[in-house]
Amino acid sequence: MPKAKYEGIYHSIKKRIEAQDYPYQSLLPSENTLIEEYACSRNTVRRALAELVADGYVQTMQGRGVRVIYQPVGKTTFTIGGIETFQETARRNRLRAVTKVTKFETVIVDECFAAKSGFSVGDELWSIERVRYLDGKALILDVNYFLKEFVPGLTPQIAASSIYDYIENTLGMQIITSKRRITVEHATARDEKLLDMGTSGCVAVVVNQTFNAAGLLFEYTQSRHQPDYFCFQDIATRKK
């Protein structure tokens, strides 16, 4: 089955759901209708629908169709779930995105950071600090560490645009898995200086360890979010 075909159908239906062309609790068109509309096989439509089920957009009901269960999540700018880039997040929320690189240097992993990050002692890393702006508000402070061996040629200009786009489309590396830990912490002086904190005295902190197709760690990131614009959202399915 051509991957591009079912992914194109998946993205098309997903956009319609997000635009509420298919509103919450409505039924999607029948399989036969979708097959005719997209000029594809039944298996291709079912693969696209399975992706939407996995993302929490729809729920299948045997013999009764496919119901939309997606609802917009208020003013959230970051939804935990898939591995989503900052630019993708901005597009999903229809917000204007700007990234300002405030630090870009090379560091060597010591024993303390190795224990925390999962990198090996002596590894050479890109150490990057970036402030993420959405519609003019400084809402996210990203502190990134990328293994130079796997991400060569990184520059501040690339960091200000999209590191993941560079990794995937220039270096050709597949980004497969991200392990995340989410906590709420008191805002630091650095948070107060760089983010539009308002009256918030805390930040939502997401720590990521990201792995490539070979299962090798290439990124350790701490993202510090202004809490008024942060949302944790997950999809859980009960298995019997």
Model-predicted regions and their roles:
Residues L49-A50:
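Short, hydrophobic-biased segments on the C-terminal half of alpha helices
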Residues A4-Y6, S30, R67-G81:
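Short, cationic-aromatic polyanion-contact patches
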Residues R96-K240:
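C-terminal all-alpha effector/ligand-binding and dimerization domain
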Residues Y22-P23, V58, A138:
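Conserved hydrophobic residue
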Residues M1-R42:
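Extreme N-terminal segment that seeds HTH/winged-HTH DNA-binding domains in transcriptional regulators
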Residues F78-N93, T102-V107:
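Short, positionally conserved secondary-structure boundary motifs
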Residues A54-G63, I69:
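Beta-hairpin "wing" of winged helix-turn-helix
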